[in-house]
């Protein structure tokens, strides 16, 4: 195993390393966004080098980081980070609204995003949300909750990463792929509970276990009796 304790430079940001590695062969260490947030990990490069990453805890790997360079063979070990796409919600339009409208919209947007268990970072009048489901599903959530007046778009994660601090990058990208598939396409906040589509995926918990929810429905009548359908069994409740 080759121990990596320091980052030599960055081939995408540092002109010196760009010139030095102009004709070099890159042996890539490919990381997903969760792995990139770790200061310690062990993984093979694309050419089979066994690399042990042991960086200071405050150091976060970035796309293009040079971890090793053999001047004789002109081969460099370079980090390639595969980031998820990001939904960018532009809040600039809210500046022209009344304080009451601004507060109401921000509260309802936060509620809608939180109800999906989606991570988010707010910066520069924009909200960044990493994709954990299809863009069509995220688009549906935004429009169903009445936020079509807020411009939003989908961009590559690499476009957003330079705008973030290390802590913001960890919050936005660290473990985003572990977020539960938990999509609710429901009516706005003032609608009665139960009017809408709920799709639950697998939930992971810190205690080491996970569980899944089959598609289920809840119906509520006037005396608050309700029925549940859970996979292969049904039961009724009266209160």
Swiss-Prot record:
It comes from the Bacteria. GO terms for biological process: protein folding. Residues 204-239 have a biased composition (Basic and acidic residues). Its main location: cytoplasm. Gene3D superfamilies: Urease metallochaperone UreE, N-terminal domain. Pfam families: UreE_N. SUPFAM superfamilies: Urease metallochaperone UreE, N-terminal domain. Belongs to the UreE family. Involved in urease metallocenter assembly. Binds nickel. Probably functions as a nickel donor during metallocenter assembly. This is Urease accessory protein UreE.
């Amino acid at each position: 195993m080759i121990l990596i304790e320091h980052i030599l430079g960055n081939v995408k940001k540092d002109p010196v390393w760009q010139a030095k590695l102009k004709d070099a062969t890159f042996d890539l260490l490919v990381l997903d966004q969760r792995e990139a947030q770790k200061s310690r990990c062990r993984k093979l490069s694309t050419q089979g080098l066994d690399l042990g990453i042991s960086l200071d805890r405050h150091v976060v790997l970035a796309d293009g980081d040079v971890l090793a360079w053999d001047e004789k063979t002109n081969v460099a070990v370079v980090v390639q980070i595969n980031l998820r796409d990001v939904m960018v919600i532009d809040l600039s339009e809210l500046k022209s609204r009344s304080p009451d409208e601004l507060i109401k919209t921000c509260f309802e947007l936060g509620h809608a995003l939180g109800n999906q268990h989606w991570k988010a970072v707010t910066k520069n009048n924009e909200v960044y949300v990493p994709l954990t489901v299809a863009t069509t599903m995220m688009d549906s959530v935004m429009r169903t909750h009445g936020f079509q007046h807020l411009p939003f778009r989908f961009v590559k994660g690499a476009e957003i990463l330079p705008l973030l601090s290390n802590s913001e990058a960890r919050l936005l990208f660290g473990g985003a792929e572990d977020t539960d598939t938990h999509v609710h396409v429901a009516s706005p906040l003032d609608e009665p509970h139960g009017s809408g589509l709920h799709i639950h995926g697998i939930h992971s918990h810190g205690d080491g276990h996970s569980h899944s929810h089959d598609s289920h429905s809840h119906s509520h009548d006037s005396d608050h009796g309700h029925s549940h359908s859970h996979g292969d069994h049904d039961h009724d409740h009266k209160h």
